[in-house]
A protein has these predicted regions:
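Extended, charge-biased low-complexity segments
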Residues: 183-185, 192
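Well-ordered, non-membrane alpha-helical segments in soluble/globular domains
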Residues: 158-174
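Non-catalytic substrate-recognition and accessory regions of acyl/acetyltransferase enzymes
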Residues: 1-156, 174-183, 197-280
Length: 280
C-alpha cells in the first residue's frame, strides 16, 4: 500500500496530508526503523511508541508521529491480506486517524494529531473496527478479553450494534481463534450508573447499557466531557454548551456539584448468544 493511496482511502484532509508529508520528507525514516518495526508488534507497541516519541524530538503538531504511524499502516496492508482480513475492515479501522484529526480540529480549531498514544493499537493490529464498533484484543481480569470501543461516528442503533457484535464474533473465530471465546467488556461514560436516570428506556444509550453487567463504577472519571460536550475535562460548567437534552442534564449535574463519571461492564452472556458469539 502506497502512502498516498492510504491517505485517499481513509479520506485524510488535504491540509493534514500536506503537513504530514512535509514532516515526513524532512525525516530520516531509516533512523526510526527499529522503533517502527516494534510499533507494529502487539507486545512491544506501547514501549516502541514512547521510544519513537523521544527519537522524533520536537513535534508540536505530532505530524512526525503521524507520518511514522501511517508508514507502518501501509505495511500493515500486506499483513491484513496474509491473514485474510478484508479491505473494508482495513480502511474502516485506519479511518481512526482521519476521525481523530477531525475531532481535534472541532475541539481546538487546529490541525494536530493528538492520539498517537492510542493509535499504536491499530498499527499493531490489536484493535479493529468491525461495523460500527471497535474491538481490542487485550487482557481483563487476568484472561484474554475483547475491549469494546464506541467510535464517535458510530451508528448507535441496537440493530447496528448487534450486527457489529455478530460480525466481530465471526471475525475472531476465523482470524484470531485464541480470542473466539474471550469475554467482552466495555469501559465508558456510556456505562455510568448515573446515566440511566437521565435517559429514556427507549434511547439507544439505555439499550446499549442493558447489554452489560456493570461491575465497576468510576464516579470521578471525566472523559465524558469530550464526548458529550466536545470540551476538555477541566472546562468550567458555565462554559459548556446546552444544545442537546443530554448536555443540559449533565450540565445541571455539574452545576449541583455532581459528576457523570463512567462505568465498566461485561457483555451479558445471553446477549452474546443472541449475537451468535461463541461461549466458554
Amino acid at each position: 500500500m502506497e502512502l498516498q493511496q492510504l491517505c485517499e482511502g481513509i479520506g485524510l484532509p488535504e491540509d493534514a496530508y500536506q503537513k504530514m508529508m512535509k514532516e515526513k520528507e524532512a525525516l530520516n525514516l531509516s533512523e526510526m526503523e527499529k522503533q517502527m518495526g516494534r510499533l507494529a508488534e502487539a507486545k512491544t507497541a506501547a514501549e516502541a511508541y514512547r521510544q519513537l516519541e523521544n527519537c522524533l524530538g520536537r513535534d508540536e503538531e505530532h505530524m512526525k508521529m503521524l507520518s511514522c504511524q501511517l508508514v507502518c499502516v501501509c505495511r500493515d496492508y500486506d499483513r491484513y491480506k496474509e491473514k485474510g482480513i478484508s479491505d473494508e475492515i482495513y480502511f474502516d479501522t485506519m479511518k481512526c486517524f482521519t476521525r481523530f484529526l477531525g475531532e481535534c480540529r472541532e475541539r481546538t480549531g487546529t490541525v494536530v494529531f493528538d492520539r498517537g498514544w492510542w493509535t499504536y493499537r491499530q498499527v499493531s493490529m490489536t484493535l479493529f473496527r468491525i461495523g460500527e464498533l471497535e474491538y481490542e484484543m487485550c487482557r481483563f481480569r487476568g484472561k484474554k478479553a475483547i475491549s469494546i470501543h464506541i467510535p464517535s461516528d458510530a451508528d448507535f442503533t441496537p440493530e447496528k450494534v448487534q450486527e457489529s457484535l455478530k460480525k466481530a464474533g465471526e471475525f475472531l473465530e476465523k482470524i484470531y481463534p485464541d480470542f473466539a471465546d474471550a469475554e467482552y467488556f466495555c469501559e465508558s461514560w456510556l456505562l455510568s450508573p448515573r446515566l440511566g436516570a437521565l435517559m429514556k428506556d427507549s434511547s439507544n444509550i439505555r439499550k446499549f447499557q442493558i447489554l452489560f453487567q456493570i461491575e465497576e463504577d468510576m464516579p470521578q472519571d471525566k472523559e465524558y466531557m469530550e464526548w458529550v460536550f466536545g470540551k476538555m475535562p477541566d472546562t468550567p460548567w458555565q462554559e459548556l454548551p446546552e444544545q442537546t437534552s443530554l448536555q443540559r442534564k449533565v450540565k445541571e449535574m455539574l452545576k449541583n456539584g455532581e459528576n457523570l463519571g463512567a462505568g465498566a461492564g461485561v457483555l451479558r452472556e445471553d446477549y452474546r448468544m443472541n449475537s451468535g458469539n461463541r461461549q466458554e
